[in-house]
């Protein structure tokens, strides 16, 4: 058994993090069209060199089912989750895999942190140098978190608020193992953020939601108001839009103290200076762990969503967030405040300057997003 010397320690109350230093194994299952096996092999060979040059990529394999020649998979290994996510949610990714599109009926992607591996002794040193292996698995509750974000035309904000505040909720049951748990919608200026929680299979839930007539009606009503051109009847246009809109969850922490009837949910918007988004997301994840771990903190759970230079935190608090602005912002420590001051684009928030102890209540007001809807399924 090969075990890395670099061992990360993730608290038991963190069911999700991409910041633990683990390598990532991605399995992409492909259902290809009958008779296109040779074309799939040729397409893979044409794109493989480009994928191999992506930062963080270690290796990949193209595999064909022993039993069914139309079932294939691509398995790849990456140095870290942030590097993989940066590529997977990019337009560059869509362009690279385009040669496969004509031959694929459907896909299913699964992403895993590498916990342990067995290797020959002579390979041990090389494997040990590639990322951390975790001392124990993360413990979770089978809930997957994801978000999408997009901007609407400034003169359409009022109409968009009406559409998103009054839509009919879709059927929460997806299948025997998957159901929608919670959907929270927020607005900051003309930016919409939709955060969803799913018990079970996220991809199955997203496909289920997209097929629901009430959701299709809402999306059709929104299309003329969105700044990015999109045609949801065109699979390529829809794929491009939702790739650009993806705002993946990169960290989640829960207190384990339970939630009472006065629990409130708020969303906070953290625009970063160019290139500072990853560092800001790491800082807020680290500080969020400390805040939730404090028995005196009102924060009972928080999730960090990150893409490029945009970070959004979803925070559940026992009582009003205004009672503890530093804890809610995850900026309650002097060192964290100083680091955030270097990373945050305070001007984009309309703030006079970087956050400091005295200005935290005002900074919370600047960062707080406008809630539109927050819907939970009855069984959740």
Curated annotation (Swiss-Prot):
It comes from the Bacteria. SUPFAM superfamilies: Dimeric alpha+beta barrel. Pfam families: ABM, SchA_CurD. Gene3D superfamilies: 3.30.70.100. Residues 24-115 form the ABM domain. Belongs to the SchA/CurD family. This is Protein SchA. It comes from Streptomyces halstedii. The gene is schA.
């Amino acid at each position: 058994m090969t075990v890395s010397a670099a061992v990360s320690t993730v608290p038991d109350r963190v069911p999700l993090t991409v910041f633990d230093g683990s390598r990532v194994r991605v399995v992409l299952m492909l259902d290809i069209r009958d008779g296109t096996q040779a074309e799939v092999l040729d397409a893979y060979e044409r794109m493989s060199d480009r994928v191999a040059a992506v930062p963080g990529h270690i290796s990949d394999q193209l595999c064909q089912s022993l039993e069914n020649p139309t079932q294939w998979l691509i398995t790849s290994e990456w140095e870290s989750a942030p590097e993989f996510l940066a590529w997977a949610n990019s337009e560059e990714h869509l362009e690279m895999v385009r040669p496969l599109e004509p031959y694929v009926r459907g896909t299913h992607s699964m992403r895993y942190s590498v916990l342990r591996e067995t290797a020959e002794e002579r390979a041990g040193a090389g494997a040990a140098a590639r990322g951390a292996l975790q001392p124990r698995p993360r413990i979770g509750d089978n809930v997957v978190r994801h978000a999408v974000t997009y901007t609407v035309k400034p003169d359409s904000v009022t109409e968009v608020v009406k559409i998103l505040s009054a839509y009919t909720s879709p059927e929460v049951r997806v299948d025997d193992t998957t159901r929608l748990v919670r959907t929270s919608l927020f607005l900051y200026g003309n930016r919409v953020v939709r955060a969803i929680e799913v018990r079970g299979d996220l991809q199955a839930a997203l496909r289920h939601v997209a097929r629901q007539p009430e959701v299709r009606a809402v999306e059709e009503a929104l299309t003329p108001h969105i700044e990015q051109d999109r045609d949801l009847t065109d699979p390529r246009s829809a794929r491009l839009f939702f790739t650009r809109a993806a705002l993946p969850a990169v960290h989640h922490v829960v207190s384990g103290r339970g939630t009472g009837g006065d629990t409130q949910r708020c969303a906070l918007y953290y625009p970063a200076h160019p290139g500072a988004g990853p560092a800001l997301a790491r800082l807020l994840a680290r500080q969020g762990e400390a805040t939730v771990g404090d028995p005196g903190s009102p924060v009972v759970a928080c999730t960090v969503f990150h893409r490029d230079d945009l970070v959004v935190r979803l925070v559940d608090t026992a009582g009003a967030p205004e009672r503890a602005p530093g804890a809610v912002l995850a900026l309650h420590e002097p060192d964290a405040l100083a680091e955030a001051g270097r990373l945050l684009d305070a001007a984009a928030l309309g703030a006079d300057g970087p956050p400091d102890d005295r200005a935290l209540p005002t900074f919370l007001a600047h960062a707080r997003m406008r809630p539109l809807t927050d819907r939970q399924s009855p069984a959740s």
